[in-house]
Design a protein with these regions (language model features):
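N-terminal secretory targeting modules
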Residues: 1-108, 306-322
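Catalytic His-Asp segment of secreted/periplasmic serine-dependent ester chemistry enzymes
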Residues: 223-322
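Solvent-exposed, polar/charged alpha-helical surfaces in well-ordered, non-transmembrane soluble domains
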Residues: 116, 120, 124-127, 154, ...
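Conserved SGNH/GDSL esterase-like catalytic core that processes O-acyl groups on lipids
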Residues: 88, 96-193, 321
Length: 322
């Protein structure tokens, strides 16, 4: 309500007399103005708040707006062995389940900037105009070690409620080689107390997703150029594997051998589909454009193999030689 409207409203009744027809007309005009003001304010609030609700990922660094795309449309009967009712999504962890068309599924992909790399590759490799819907909600510089900066369990709870995915892809860890605060005390990476606390957070994220009815695929960290940093990633990968083993509706996918040369070491260049390509960025951490396609191709193949569905990358990018 503006100050002029308030003044006019009070002036009509300031002498205590009964308002006449002219006063009633003025009163109706004032009230109409107030109604328009209230409606306008309500609309503005909704327009401003909506993006923060629907787009929780960061606006800077490697992050982009959420990507929603699609993959192969296929129609097929639901397998009798499917563990959960997905309403047309045929992903299944049941041993011996027949391989069927993937159906209509929503895949939520979350993680740090390496997760972003994976998500961008998936957005290109999952065919458009079909019924596998990708929702990419990564945030750079995040992980599970610093919940004070970004609380992934809380964010995931919101995302699960918004998108109701049948599969959650998790790819993070690049920022987690650091100390943590637990119950007000600082604990150092990778002490026994640290690994125990971190494993608890890993399991919390997995359980939160599977309790919502989704399956989980945790994509591990790759070999890194810096040997010490790479060793830290191996420690984290072992914790992701432990977390996944505790839940029958979750799977772990290792990328270590995929991006290691025959000697098991970091190498930035390899032949992809017979052509020499850079797989990694100059920082020795992130994936290049081609590397994004390589990991996306690999993850799509792993989704098909682990969850018994027919799923083929649009333009498969495969390492053919080192």
């Amino acid at each position: 309500m503006d100050g002029n409207a308030t003044g006019r409203f009070e002036e009509e009744f300031s002498d205590g007399s009964r308002p006449g027809r002219a006063s009633n007309h003025k009163l109706r005009m004032v009230l109409s103005g107030l109604l328009v003001l209230l409606v306008t304010t309500s609309v503005v609030v909704r327009v401003v708040r909506a993006p923060t609700t629907l787009s929780p990922l960061a606006q800077t660094g490697h992050d982009k707006a959420p990507v929603q795309t699609s993959a192969p449309h296929a129609v097929g009967p639901a397998s009798a062995n499917v563990v959960r009712e997905f309403g047309g999504c045929e992903l299944s962890v049941s041993a011996g389940a027949p391989v069927v068309p993937v159906g209509s599924c929503t895949v939520l992909e979350i993680g740090d900037s390496l997760g972003n790399d994976l998500g961008w590759g998936l957005a290109r490799e999952l065919p458009s105009g079909s019924s596998l819907n990708l929702v990419q909600l990564d945030k750079s510089a995040t992980g599970l070690a610093n919940a004070g900066y970004y609380d992934w369990p809380t964010e995931l709870e919101t995302d699960l409620g918004l998108y109701h995915p049948q599969l959650v892809l998790i790819c993070l860890g690049g920022n987690d080689e650091q100390g943590m605060e637990v119950d007000g005390s600082a604990i150092q990476f990778p002490s026994p107390a640290w690994t125990a606390a971190y494993l608890t957070r890993v399991r919390q994220l997995i359980t939160e997703a599977t309790a919502s009815g989704a399956l989980v695929m945790w994509v591990g960290m790759p070999v890194m150029e810096d040997p010490d940093y790479s060793q830290g990633m191996e420690i984290l990968n072992s914790l992701y594997q432990q977390g996944v083993r505790a839940d029958p509706n979750a799977a772990f996918v290792s990328t270590w051998q995929l991006f290691s040369n025959p000697e098991g070491a970091y190498q930035a260049v390899a032949d992809v589909n017979g052509i020499p390509e850079n797989l990694r960025e100059p920082d020795g951490i992130h994936y290049s454009f081609t590397g994004e396609d390589v990991i996306a191709t690999y993850v799509i193949d792993e989704i098909a193999a682990n969850f018994h569905v027919q799923l083929t990358p649009t333009n498969p990018a495969v390492i053919t030689d080192w």
